[in-house]
Curated annotation (Swiss-Prot):
This is Large ribosomal subunit protein uL5. GO terms for biological process: translation. It comes from Pectobacterium carotovorum subsp. carotovorum (strain PC1). Belongs to the universal ribosomal protein uL5 family. This is one of the proteins that bind and probably mediate the attachment of the 5S RNA into the large ribosomal subunit, where it forms part of the central protuberance. In the 70S ribosome it contacts protein S13 of the 30S subunit (bridge B1b), connecting the 2 subunits; this bridge is implicated in subunit movement. Contacts the P site tRNA; the 5S rRNA and some of its associated proteins might help stabilize positioning of ribosome-bound tRNAs. The gene is rplE.
């Protein structure tokens, strides 16, 4: 079992129960899922780019990504409905906890010119979204085999009812928020 999951059950639950005066342990917010999304707009011209992006995402997440397709045709972007334009992975359970642990302790500190994550990226319901400009911050990606530096979106979905609860949950995991 991931260390972070044990830490959540032993420490974070107690801390949040006292902070927000919950009556039941089930009221304490928890991380539900983590979604990783990589949009590959250049995949229209070169299909190989999407395969490379999917391979990178598979290495980062540990599971095979789903290829996302365009929902509707947009002439300005030269895409048609059904064209593959990106890939995504939804992590739950053990893989989610392991990824979150790697994100906080290894990947985020490796971000170039890092000054902390924005605490304003909550959506109003306790879910946190962040963008990563380079996939090479993850140790699973071999820098020499990267054909192109791509970014990805990371969304952490929680059961929190408000942004304050979600922020307190992630701060309890020592998320490096900007002061």
């Amino acid at each position: 079992m991931a260390k972070l999951h044990d830490y959540y059950k032993d420490e974070v639950v107690k801390k949040l129960m006292t902070e927000f005066n919950y009556n039941s342990v089930m009221q304490v917010p928890r991380v539900e899922k983590i979604t990783l999304n990589m949009g590959v707009g250049e995949a229209i011209a070169d299909k190989k780019l999407l395969d490379n992006a999917a391979a990178d995402l598979a290495a980062i997440s540990g599971q095979k990504p789903l290829i996302t397709k365009a929902r509707k045709s947009v002439a300005g972007f030269k895409i048609r409905q059904g064209y593959p334009i990106g890939c995504k992975v939804t992590l739950r359970g053990e893989r989610m906890w392991e990824f979150l642990e790697r994100l906080i302790s290894i990947a985020v500190p490796r971000i170039r010119d890092f000054r902390g994550l924005s605490a304003k990226s909550f959506d109003g319901r306790g879910n946190y979204s962040m963008g990563v400009r380079e996939q090479i911050i993850f140790p699973e990606i071999d820098y020499d085999k990267v054909d192109r530096v791509r970014g990805l979106d990371i969304t952490i979905t929680t059961t929190a009812k408000s942004d304050d609860e979600g922020r307190a949950l992630l701060a309890a995991f020592n998320f490096p928020f900007r002061k």
